[in-house]
Each structure stands twice: as structure tokens, then as C-alpha cells.
UniProtKB/Swiss-Prot annotation:
Full protein name: Major capsid protein
Domain of life per record: Viruses
Ranges of biased composition (kind: Basic residues): 37-48
Species assigned in the record: Barley yellow dwarf virus (isolate PAV) (BYDV)
InterPro entries: Luteo_coat, Viral_coat
């Protein structure tokens, strides 16, 4: 009887100590302070990196890429950079409606040829910073229709040194191909950097 009585308390003590040890282990496994630390650091880093692109209370810089497709060997037209840029709704119907002032600081115009090697002719472009021309007046800048090439224009050439109202165009780019057929020529792929100021 005594031996049975001794075994009983020992088991109870062992169970008690085991339960206590399990309870003490639980808060060690859940390391909440360490998890909270990295989350705050990551949150701060995201806030710093995305401030200019998410909130942008005072402005920022965006890069837009768009294309002008189905150019023919005898195509002509005008691309109006600003609120009239229908080829890039992300700019004309998007970001410019959220800011009072903007400036396009650079553009890269790539003519991507889809023409055959036998297609003759060239496509000329001209920058109009007065936004008044209705037809091409200069034939200095050109692309050979049968070859892919690109040209880059900085702020000095596109009236991009000063901010202006988001309700007016900054410049136009006129183009004209000198071919005599409607053969496929290619497309323009245009990349531009836009600075923004004063959110609405």
C-alpha cells in the first residue's frame, strides 16, 4: 500500500512538471517581438521607396511606353504630347488629371520596321514645340523604312525644362513617310519620362 501511495504522487508530480514545462515552452515558440520588428522595417522601406509613386503629394517621375502602330510607306500625321496624347491614355486620361503641372523631360523614339528589305523610302519626324504646325516642315530627322533605329530627344529639344499646366500640350511630333505605296512600314515605340508637380 505504501509503495502504491508513493507511486501515485510521483506520477502526479511528473505530470504536473510536464504540464508546467509545456506551458512555459509555448510563449517561447511564438516569437512575436521578432516578427513585429521586420514588419515595421519592411513597412518603412516600402513607404520610402514608394512615396513618389503611391502618394506623390508634391509630384514625382513616371516613365511611359506606348506605340503608334500600322504605319504605311506613305503615312503622315502628328503625335501630340500632353493631354491630347490619345495614343497613351495612361498619361492623357490618367496621371495628367491628377496633377496641375507636368513636364516631359526626355523621349526615345524607336521606329521598328516591319517592311521588307525591298521596301524603299524613309519616314521623317519633326518636333513642334509651338504646337501649331499642321504639316511637316523639316526633313532633318529620318528613319529608313526597311531598318529599325531609334532617336532620343532631351528636354532642350522638347520644351521640357519648365513645368507647365497639365491642360496644354508640351510639344507635337509630326511624321511623314515619302513612299508612294500603302505597303507596311512599321511602328513607333516611344518611351518618355514625365515629371509631375502639385497634386489636385
Amino acid at each position: 500500500m505504501n509503495s502504491v501511495g508513493r507511486r501515485g504522487p510521483r506520477r502526479a508530480n511528473q505530470n504536473g512538471t510536464r504540464r508546467r514545462r509545456r506551458r512555459t515552452v509555448r510563449p517561447v515558440v511564438v516569437v512575436q517581438p521578432n516578427r513585429a520588428g521586420p514588419r515595421r522595417r519592411n513597412g518603412r522601406r516600402k513607404g520610402r521607396g514608394g512615396a513618389n509613386f503611391v502618394f506623390r503629394p508634391t509630384g514625382g517621375t513616371e516613365v511611359f511606353v506606348f506605340s503608334v502602330d500600322n504605319l504605311k510607306a506613305n503615312s503622315s500625321g502628328a503625335i501630340k504630347f500632353g493631354p491630347s496624347l490619345s495614343q497613351c491614355p495612361a498619361l492623357s486620361d490618367g496621371i495628367l488629371k491628377s496633377y496641375h503641372r507636368y513636364k516631359i523631360t526626355s523621349i526615345r523614339v524607336e521606329f521598328k520596321s516591319h517592311a521588307s528589305a525591298n521596301t524603299a523610302g524613309a519616314i521623317f519626324i519633326e518636333l513642334d514645340t509651338a504646337c501649331k504646325q499642321s504639316a511637316l516642315g523639316s526633313y532633318i530627322n529620318s528613319f529608313t523604312i526597311s531598318k529599325t533605329a531609334s532617336k532620343t530627344f532631351r528636354s532642350e529639344a522638347i520644351n521640357g525644362k519648365e513645368f507647365q499646366e497639365s491642360t496644354i500640350d508640351q510639344f507635337w511630333m509630326l511624321y511623314k513617310a515619302n513612299g508612294t505605296t500603302t505597303d507596311t512600314a512599321g511602328q513607333f515605340i516611344i518611351t518618355m519620362s514625365v515629371s509631375l508637380m502639385t497634386a489636385k
